[in-house]
Amino acid sequence: MKPIRLFSGVLILAVSTLAQDTKTAAVATAPQAQASQPAPTLASAIDREISDIEKQVLDAADAMPEDKFNFSPESLNLPGGNYKGVRTFAVQVKHIAASNYFIWSGITGDKLPDNLKDGNGPEDVKTKAEILKFLRNSFALGHKAAATLTPENMLQTPGHSKSTRLRLATFGVAHAFNHYGQMVEYLRMNGIVPPASRTKSD
């Protein structure tokens, strides 16, 4: 799926979520409204989308046994397949985290981790525990970025970026969803049902 379609889909989903939440809040009775959560905002709608993909990616990463973290489809030598040079599962996860930092730091202005040099993530982050920590920290930056969004600043282009704050926020989500789909295939190639797809019998 092309990045622009992913971005558009995430943006539509976020706007739909905000609209639905606003509609629900509007029809609540006065006592119910007082007892309910605060009215949704642009920031909370984007934050909800980040939370959704964060859970799926983290659960999928945690589901892969550590001894399979360096798995790549190239090792299967599938007939008719061409997986030469594709990322290992570990690097897929680190790529999501690295991209989260690169994308969302454009909104927050946070300094990148000293050991983050490229899109494949730090070379010294190797164990499953280290990779999951790196991943969690990258999503924490996403939540920080979402919290800064307002209707007034969402179309501003921060710093040296050519993209608006809103596009950066939603593109981070779209990019993570793209690579989550690849993580799912890696899990299934190893006989593991992704947590988000499991039933009670799994």
Give the role of each language-model region:
Residues 1-8:
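Bacterial N-terminal signal peptides that target proteins for export
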Residues 14-16:
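N-terminal signal peptide c-region/cleavage motif recognized by signal peptidases
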Residues 22-53:
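Short N-terminal segments immediately surrounding and downstream of signal-peptide cleavage
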Residues 47, 51-58, 70-119, 157-202:
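Short, contiguous alpha-helical
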